[in-house]
């Protein structure tokens, strides 16, 4: 049955042309928001706008102190689920809970770039994947008492840190894991320190230079490790160092000058907090809270390439002459500091709703382009039944379909300025959204009170993690909810000009709830963990939720990652929430730099191995591995296309013309002609980012076939977008 808009709305006179200053036209503001210049203020502290439930198939681990919502997609996730024995990457180190006989404790490893393993064919260029070996137990923090029984507890789980405690009859060994930490630090309470090595200790020597006892262990693999201790240590055998006094033990790998470690020894990071001001959005800080005392009053922290590329002079001046390789993200540099201060470049202010590219910005439309777009609109708006098409059991699929309809709405409302078509499409979009906002979809959402988040009920009761791509296990929430958030922003924009303006009020709490689930900026919002998906240290989001994985967290779509924060940016504009809009802009700025180092590879990329970068895109980026693949197949169009979709005004900010042209010429031009499904449309719209004319001609052609469209893609948006950037 074809759905039509209500007849009464068609008789209304056309509205005035909406101004381009979208932010200026918004009047809805948060009346209850506390006055603060911080970027990191709550979106809301209200109860979630979905029902509550107490069932979840993944049990919580044993905690020693955890009074906040628990992170689900974080770097220490392997310590929360399963056997809790898989590695955690703080970078540059990996650590893990070892249960091996005679080696019970916290294993420590660092792998150099020379140890990387390449495959399938290591001599190929490009290779399909590379990874760093795991489980090389260079050193292990333990105690003799732990070998005879203990309990592992995790606690104080924050966004950038997590505590691990080995309890033994009221005594303990505690380690705080912090991203980028310079030392692996253990505090022994009532237990005698013991350090073991599976590699073996060739030489163990006490040295001067620190207020603490200082030792250097040379292992049989010729790596050198420095150990600081508050008490005396002795080499018992080639695999064991023992101490007799409870207290502090710190371990780090030597990589040049020892003096910076000496200056930092005795102090360690207990937690890291974010700070940033809405008055200077591009500037953000990692503030490190230190425990203990060092000669310098500072500690060693390691930085990744996307960080030290934008360090403020105050941080850059604290660099020391030490470098260690990361697993997948190039060389890390060390800093003797208590704070990282970064000055990031932000997206251009004009990147909002209308088509935009780095080539020409927004070019506007000639009459013949408008005529073509109008013809397509008349066909597609009538034929696309968004109300029923979005009625699925998948938040991901439904989100893509809603966003397809929202892009179509934008075109008829703000490109064609066709009041009749706009109201017809707006009516359908509001009805489609009503199903989700009123939680009447096939698999309703629930706020589950164990891990504390909004999940699909699909798979929740039976633990089927294949349902909706693992949504109930916190997989891909920024992908799934990002589509809904973005679509809602476009509908709210159109409703202000062509409707009664009620959609914003009706949808506000629900959309805010989705935003809070994926990107809650503040601990003051006690319903959700802070920044579930986006990792400020790694510079991008992680999609993997409550699953143990031997290579750590991962992400296979850079584009659906930034699409989420693009949607949040637009929602901030629509709602008048300037701090939210600025926060999203900062995240987008960070992601642009990181993604173009670690996921999208121009020919001048110097971060990934030279024998991998000709792939042009990462495929799946893990914490310990990059695999040029997807979870749903190995076709070239899959691997590249999942890093493209959806193509939006934000796409060209990330995918610059040089990269897109290189990728097209080297990887895609030989493939696209043989495609006969939705991936063809994805690749051809991506072509608009360097060749908008060819892209426009493809979508505008009379013999265009709709089977060439992905289910989240419309011919109408593809034509309007490519035409609007010079096609």
Question: What do the predicted segments below correspond to?
Answer:
Residues 490-536, 567-570:
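Alpha-helical scaffolds that organize eukaryotic protein assemblies
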Residues 3-478, 521-539, 544-545, 575, ...:
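Ser/Thr/Asn(+Pro)-rich, low-complexity disordered segments
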């Amino acid at each position: 049955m074809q759905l039509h808009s209500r007849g009464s709305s068609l008789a209304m006179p056309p509205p005035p042309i909406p101004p381009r200053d979208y932010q200026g036209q918004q009047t809805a503001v948060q009346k209850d928001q506390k006055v603060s210049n911080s970027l990191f203020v709550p979106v809301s502290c209200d109860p979630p706008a979905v029902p509550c439930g107490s069932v979840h198939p993944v049990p919580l681990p044993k905690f020693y102190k955890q009074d906040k919502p628990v992170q689900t997609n974080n770097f220490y996730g392997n310590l929360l689920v399963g056997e809790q024995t898989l590695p955690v990457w703080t970078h540059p180190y990996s650590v893990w809970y070892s249960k091996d006989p005679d080696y019970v404790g916290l294993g420590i490893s660092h792998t150099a770039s020379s140890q990387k393993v390449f495959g399938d064919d290591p001599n190929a260029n490009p290779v399909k994947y590379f990874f760093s070996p795991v489980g090389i137990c260079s050193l292990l923090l333990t105690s003799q008492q732990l070998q005879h029984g203990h309990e592992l507890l995790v606690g104080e789980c924050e966004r950038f840190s997590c505590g691990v405690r080995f309890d033994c009859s009221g005594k303990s060994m505690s380690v705080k894991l912090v991203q980028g930490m310079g030392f692996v630090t253990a505090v022994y309470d009532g237990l005698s320190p013991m350090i073991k090595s599976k590699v073996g200790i060739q030489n163990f020597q006490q040295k001067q230079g620190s207020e603490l006892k200082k030792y250097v262990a040379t292992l049989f693999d010729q790596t050198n490790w420095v150990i600081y201790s508050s008490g005396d240590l002795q080499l018992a055998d080639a695999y064991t160092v023992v101490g007799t006094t409870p207290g502090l033990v710190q371990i780090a790998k030597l990589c040049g000058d020892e003096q910076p470690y000496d200056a930092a020894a005795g102090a360690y990071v207990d937690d890291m907090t974010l700070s940033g001001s809405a008055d200077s959005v591009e500037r953000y800080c990692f503030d490190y809270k230190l425990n203990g005392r060092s000669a310098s009053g500072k500690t060693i922290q390691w930085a990744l390439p996307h960080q030290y590329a934008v360090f403020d002079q105050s941080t850059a001046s604290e660099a020391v002459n030490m470098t260690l390789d990361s697993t997948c993200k190039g060389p890390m540099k060390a800093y003797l500091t208590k704070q990282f201060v970064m000055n990031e470049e932000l997206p251009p202010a004009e990147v909002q709703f209308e088509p935009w590219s780095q080539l020409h910005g927004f070019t506007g439309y000639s009459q013949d382009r408008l005529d073509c777009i109008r013809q397509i609109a008349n066909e597609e708006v009538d034929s696309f039944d968004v109300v029923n098409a979005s009625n699925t059991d998948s938040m991901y699929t439904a989100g893509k379909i809603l966003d397809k309809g929202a892009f179509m709405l934008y075109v008829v409302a703000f490109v064609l300025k066709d009041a009749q078509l706009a109201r017809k499409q707006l009516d359908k979009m509001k009805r489609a959204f009503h199903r989700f906002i009123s939680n009447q979809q096939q698999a309703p959402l629930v706020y589950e009170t164990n891990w504390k988040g909004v999940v699909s009920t699909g798979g929740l009761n039976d633990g089927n993690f294949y349902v909706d791509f693992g949504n109930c296990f916190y997989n891909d929430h920024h992908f799934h909810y990002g589509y809904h958030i973005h679509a809602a922003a476009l509908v709210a924009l159109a409703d202000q000009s062509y409707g009664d303006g009620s959609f914003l009020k009706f949808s506000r709490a629900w959309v805010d709830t989705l935003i809070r689930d994926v990107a809650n900026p503040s601990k003051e919002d006690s319903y959700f963990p802070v920044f579930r998906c986006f990792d400020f240290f790694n510079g991008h989001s992680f999609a993997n939720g409550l699953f143990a994985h031997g290579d750590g967290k991962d992400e296979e779509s850079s584009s659906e990652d930034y699409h989420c924060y693009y949607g949040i940016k637009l929602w901030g504009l629509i709602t008048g929430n300037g701090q939210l809009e600025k926060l999203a802009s900062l995240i987008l700025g960070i992601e642009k730099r990181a993604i173009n180092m670690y996921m999208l590879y121009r020919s001048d990329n110097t971060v990934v191995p030279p024998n991998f970068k000709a792939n042009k895109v990462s495929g799946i980026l893990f914490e310990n591995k990059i695999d040029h693949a997807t979870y749903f197949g190995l076709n070239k169009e899959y691997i590249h296309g999942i890093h493209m979709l959806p193509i939006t005004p934000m796409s060209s900010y990330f995918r610059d013309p040089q990269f897109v042209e290189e990728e097209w010429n080297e990887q895609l031009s030989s493939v696209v002609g043989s495609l006969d499904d939705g991936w063809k449309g994805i690749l051809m719209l991506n072509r608009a980012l360097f060749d908008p004319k060819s892209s426009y001609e493809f979508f505008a052609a009379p013999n265009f076939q709709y089977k060439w469209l992905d289910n989240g893609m419309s011919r109408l948006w593809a034509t309007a977008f490519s035409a609007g950037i010079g096609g």
